């Protein structure tokens, strides 16, 4: 795989995880 493909896969994997963490922290504060 090229560096671009690796970066794309990492981004696709990390974005939902980051969004879930942000949503979870927001819900925990409310």
Curated annotation (Swiss-Prot):
The keyword Transmembrane helix applies. It is a single-pass membrane protein. This is Photosystem I reaction center subunit XII. GO terms for cellular component: photosystem I; plasma membrane-derived thylakoid membrane. Disulfide bonds: none annotated. One of its GO terms (biological process) is photosynthesis. The lineage of its organism: Bacteria, Bacillati, Cyanobacteriota, Cyanophyceae, Synechococcales. The keyword Membrane applies. Belongs to the PsaM family. It is found in: Cellular thylakoid membrane. The chain crosses the membrane at residues 6-26. InterPro entries: PSI_PsaM (IPR010010), PSI_PsaM_sf (IPR037279). The gene is psaM. Keywords: Membrane, Photosynthesis, Photosystem I, Thylakoid, Transmembrane, Transmembrane helix. It comes from the Bacteria. It comes from Synechococcus sp. (strain JA-2-3B'a(2-13)) (Cyanobacteria bacterium Yellowstone B-Prime). Its main location: membrane.
């Amino acid at each position: 795989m090229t560096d671009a493909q690796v970066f794309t896969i990492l981004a696709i994997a990390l974005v939902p995880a980051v969004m879930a963490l942000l949503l979870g922290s927001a819900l925990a504060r409310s």
